[in-house]
């Protein structure tokens, strides 16, 4: 059988739109790209399972070989929406220019699957002793639905996992989590000349912001991980809106904030800290304060520095293992087995106009993936 060339894989992945978004006008699902991956994997001898988690939202698990343990190579098939007016290249076409592949998903991260397929083609699998798994998930860019569902329901037990997010081929063994909430204060509007006839939502929010800043300082003092460039949890007040006129008592105010917890800080524990910080204000103003998550919270993630996958992958890549501050699906897959994040392209290209992958990543990525397959499947 004649298999597609590397560039053909890449072209078809990028030209197949698979945008996920909380805005229903953008949200597309990923069925078409999953079906293409399924056919390619089957052509290479893999057993393929496809699961529809929600309508149009699919996960794919491919397995090459048999036995216990092995290696799981994982990634997401969805992309973010795009602003066409800011792109100089067609987002859903693979454009070659400036020694780069341009297109939506070239770095983040549909293109990674082309590297996996190319590495599989280049290996003689005759003496394989452990399975290779390929996981392609849905909705990483929104809810991480695919990874959450897979980690909670799968029966496979690989020895190790590599997630191919763009890390410039530097192995990543940890990152912070992300929690984002909206706090809405409902006051009572009225004319500013008589404050007693109203309840000023901005004044209540001022108390809340002071409490959050106190919590921010507490997080800095009480939690520390020297493995991170910013070694403490961060809390940021990112957006606020309230009121409509200087001579009117503010009847409503809303604040959006986020927290990036270190690995080891549980989401329940963090939520309790946030609630404790506001409990006196909530008691003072009953029924006027609502806290709503802006997305499903993501825990921090850390793979032990002593794990064999850490040392062996660092040797294969010739790079020191690092930690980062952005989020991936790693916290969920780490529940299955020791997990690293490692892939071609730069995170600086993620979610940007004219997203690209430099040609200089192509040969090293195929080489690294081939070595990882030999290391953990033979």
UniProtKB/Swiss-Prot annotation:
This is Acetylornithine deacetylase. One of its GO terms (molecular function) is zinc ion binding. Its EC number is 3.5.1.16. Belongs to the peptidase M20A family. ArgE subfamily. Gene3D superfamilies: 3.30.70.360, Zn peptidases. One of its GO terms (cellular component) is cytoplasm. Its cofactor is Zn(2+); Co(2+); glutathione. It catalyses: N(2)-acetyl-L-ornithine + H2O = L-ornithine + acetate. SUPFAM superfamilies: Bacterial exopeptidase dimerisation domain, Zn-dependent exopeptidases. It is found in: Cytoplasm. It comes from Aliivibrio fischeri (strain ATCC 700601 / ES114). Keywords: Amino-acid biosynthesis, Arginine biosynthesis, Cobalt, Cytoplasm, Hydrolase, Metal-binding, Zinc. The gene is argE.
């Amino acid at each position: 059988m004649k298999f597609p060339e590397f560039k053909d894989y890449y072209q078809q992945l990028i030209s197949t739109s698979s945008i996920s978004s909380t805005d229903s006008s953008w949200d597309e699902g990923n069925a078409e790209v999953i079906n293409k991956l399924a056919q390619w994997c089957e052509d290479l001898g893999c057993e393929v399972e496809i699961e529809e988690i929600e309508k149009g939202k699919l996960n794919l698990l491919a397995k090459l070989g048999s036995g216990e343990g092995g290696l799981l190579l994982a990634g997401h098939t969805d992309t973010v929406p795009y602003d066409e007016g800011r792109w100089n290249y067609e987002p859903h076409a693979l454009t070659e220019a400036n020694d780069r592949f341009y297109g939506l998903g070239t770095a983040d991260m549909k293109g990674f699957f082309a590297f996996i397929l190319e590495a599989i083609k280049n290996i003689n699998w005759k003496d394989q002793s452990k399975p290779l798994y390929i996981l392609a998930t849905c909705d990483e860019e929104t809810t991480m639905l695919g990874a959450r569902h897979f980690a909670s329901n799968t029966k496979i037990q690989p020895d190790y996992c590599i997630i191919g997010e763009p890390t410039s081929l530097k192995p990543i063994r940890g990152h912070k989590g992300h929690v984002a909430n909206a706090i809405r204060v409902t006051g009572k509007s009225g004319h500013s000349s008589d404050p007693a006839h109203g309840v000023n939502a901005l004044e209540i929010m001022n108390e809340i912001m002071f409490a959050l800043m106190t919590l921010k300082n507490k997080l800095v003092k009480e939690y520390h991980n020297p493995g991170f460039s910013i070694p403490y949890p961060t809390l940021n007040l990112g957006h606020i809106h309230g009121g409509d006129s200087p001579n009117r008592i503010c009847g409503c105010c809303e604040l959006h904030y986020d927290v990036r917890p270190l690995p080891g800080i549980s989401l329940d524990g963090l939520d309790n800290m946030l609630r404790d910080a506001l409990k006196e204000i909530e008691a003072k103003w009953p029924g006027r304060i609502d806290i709503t998550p802006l997305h499903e919270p993501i825990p921090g993630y850390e793979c032990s520095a002593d794990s064999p996958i850490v040392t062996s992958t660092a040797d294969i890549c010739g790079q020191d293992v690092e930690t980062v501050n952005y989020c991936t699906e790693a916290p969920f897959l780490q529940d299955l087995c020791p997990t690293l994040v490692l892939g071609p392209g730069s995170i600086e290209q993620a979610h940007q106009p004219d997203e690209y992958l430099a040609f200089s990543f192509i040969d090293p990525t195929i080489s690294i993936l081939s070595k990882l397959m030999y290391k953990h499947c033979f």
